[in-house]
A protein has these predicted regions:
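N-terminal glycine-rich phosphate-binding loop for ADP-containing cofactors
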Residues: 1-151
Length: 151
């Protein structure tokens, strides 16, 4: 099971069955997710980063690329990539802080390592500033500082 971030605001959850998963367990999980938590459920194959992270992290990486190319600031980009375009107010960089910068780096590395034939493979590289923040312990919301700092 994989929740989309931030889970309290995002409607979808992914269920990823293995070959040995009991269908009754999946049915029970889907029922719990839909009726108790009010989530929409998407079934996904067991592939690197499932559906949500493949699309979401690619979107973040593309945004990072364009942020650098157009010399934009993080606040400016989040102002453009949140509710203005139908996304959560956490937008791009704040969502990265919520997910955790260490988690982001792991997902990016997984994409780079496991998807060599993807046409966008050249973008599956964490920027140097991400590594610098992680090395300082600025892992995002869970550490009180990441791309943004809680004051």
């Amino acid at each position: 099971m994989h929740f989309f971030n931030p889970p309290r605001y995002m409607h979808l959850a992914e269920l990823i069955p293995a070959n040995t998963t009991d269908p009754a367990v999946l049915e029970g999980l889907e029922t719990f997710l839909t009726t108790t938590l009010g989530k929409g459920v998407v079934y996904a194959k067991d592939t690197p980063n499932f559906i949500g992270n493949r699309i979401g992290v690619f979107s973040i990486l593309a945004t990072i690329h364009h942020t650098h190319a157009f010399k934009l600031g993080f606040d400016e980009v989040d102002g453009l990539t949140g509710p203005l375009v139908g996304r959560p107010k956490s937008a791009t960089f704040r969502t990265s802080d919520v997910v955790g910068l260490d988690t982001m780096a792991h997902v990016i590395k997984t994409m780079g390592d496991t998807l060599p034939d993807d046409p966008w493979h050249k973008y599956f590289i964490a920027p140097a500033w991400l590594g610098a923040l992680i090395s300082k312990g600025a892992l995002g919301q869970k550490a009180g500082a990441g791309i943004f700092r809680k004051v």
